[in-house]
Structures are given as C-alpha cells and as structure tokens.
C-alpha cells in the first residue's frame, strides 16, 4: 500500500466532476489497490472520509470510516442520494482545505444507493456524522468544496489564511 498525495484548495483539479465507474472495473486488482491506498491515505492524514477527486482520480467513489476505532470502512461507488430528511449544522473540515473549519448545514438523515467494494448494489440509511460525511465527500465528486457554502467574504478569508499557511511552510 502507498500514501497518495492529497490535492489542496485552490487546486483547480478539485473542481473536476468525477465520472461514473463501470461495474466491471470495481473488482479489478488495480481498483482494489487504489481503494486500499485511499484508506491508508485517509487514516494517515488523519481523516474520516476521502473522495477519489481529492487524490486526483476523477472517478465517482469515496472511502469513509467515521468510527473511533477506525474499524468500519465503507466504500461508496457511484453513490446517489435517494432521500433526505431534516437539517443539521455541523462544523466541517477537509483534508483538501487544511486547518480550516466552518459550520455547514446538511440533511440530518439520508438514504444513499451505491455499489460496494465487491460491486454489489447497496442502500444505506445514514444519520449524524456518517450522513454529513457522505454528503461532504459526494460534493467533492461534483467538484464542490465545503467552503463553497460560505459567504464570498468568508471564502476569501479562507483563501488568504491558506496562502499564509503555505508561505510559513515553504
């Protein structure tokens, strides 16, 4: 397994809309290795979710594990939200927008259809942190970032803060 480089805002590749994955590709050794590498990258970061777009792979899938013990890995391939209910404000962060956190309102519970790691059709009802994480990662697959939900003024403040952070690292 290998760690993958994570793209960071304002990299324009984060705005790429991911393409659907052919079901036949899911069980290939190359795809399975990519999934393993994404989990390793996510756990190492550390994070609770990682969309393929964030590692410059523009295919419609993501890996998530919101458990404290990091023992409940989920792979969502070609995910589609088929039902939403309620609203909840959650403070979100992102591996592609390091050090920035902001309140975002999302559906409280969702039902998502997807292919699992074995290419089997699944449907999951998710709530709380898992629902938030699924919606956040699905935004990545559509070329959206959580900071897009902020006002233009706050988004510009984020851009300046990240530029300043990069200057101190260099």
Swiss-Prot record:
Its cofactor is Fe(2+). Binds 1 Fe(2+) ion. This is Peptide deformylase. Removes the formyl group from the N-terminal Met of newly synthesized proteins. Requires at least a dipeptide for an efficient rate of reaction. N-terminal L-methionine is a prerequisite for activity but the enzyme has broad specificity at other positions. GO terms for biological process: co-translational protein modification; translation. It comes from Stenotrophomonas maltophilia (strain R551-3). InterPro entries: Peptide_deformylase, Peptide_deformylase_sf. PANTHER family: PEPTIDE DEFORMYLASE. Fe cation binds at residues 94, 136, 140. The keyword DNA damage does not apply. It holds the Pfam family Pep_deformylase. It catalyses: N-terminal N-formyl-L-methionyl-[peptide] + H2O = N-terminal L-methionyl-[peptide] + formate. Belongs to the polypeptide deformylase family. The active site is at 137. One of its GO terms (molecular function) is metal ion binding. SUPFAM superfamilies: Peptide deformylase (SSF56420). Keywords: Hydrolase, Iron, Metal-binding, Protein biosynthesis. NCBIfam families: pept_deformyl, PRK00150.1-3. It is an enzyme of class 3 (hydrolase). Its EC number is 3.5.1.88.
